[in-house]
Amino acid sequence: DICAYISGLEQYFIKTGQIDRVRVAADEPGDFERYRKSLDIVRKTAPAFRYKTAFDHAEFLDHCEEGITDYAPNFYCACSQYEQLKKMQKERPDSRLQWYICCGPGYPNTFLKSDLLEARFLGIMNALLGFDGLLRWTYTCWTDHPLEDIRYGNWRAGDLCLVYPAKNGGILKSLRWKALKRGIEDYELLERIRELGREDVIEQIFHLLLREENVSNYILEDWEVLSDIFVNDYAVFEQARQIMLNNLEGMLE
């Protein structure tokens, strides 16, 4: 019985002290009535669970359910519905608002064909959006022989994983993973600067790295994406990093 199983899971996470970390996730629901009914069943069966929904249709915003703690629109929705999402973020301070990339957009992303600076830019993008984080659906979704061939179906190579299996049972970090980590560090530096009230420094970084600062302009007709959102120059990103470090050093002295 599925309800007994769900209830058992809830009790396990409560007993192990992990219930606050658990999210019951919905992935791009298209049938809102079916989604709502399923959500109601789980709520009644396991009331302690929290909920997370990744959505790729802007219409979902008109069907947002109370009780969902984590919202994650895809890149297209995050940009095209930015003002509406920021309003929702303000109205629901106890919720987390993330955004995600997956098999799209083609740019910026973390495919094998993607410039490594695209992965690093994702940290800057999150700071620009002012959201609570980035969701990437893949980490270890490996093919049968990922060290030889990571192509799968119609997905772009690299879409399914950011790391590879090591012979010792651990993982091998890809250059894409390392570039993303660098971008996360950039984001954390910007957030520390924001906490210290230096919006002028943040604006300086955005002016330096971005060719277009209005995210609403990133989405073109037919869901095409602006092709040159940021300055694709590693030296400029390192210049921005040094500006952030220098300013933080001065603020904390």
Tell me the role of every PLM-derived stretch.
Residues 1-58, 131, 147-253:
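Catalytic domains of carbohydrate-active enzymes that cleave complex glycans
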Residues 1-147:
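Catalytic-core regions of glycoside hydrolase
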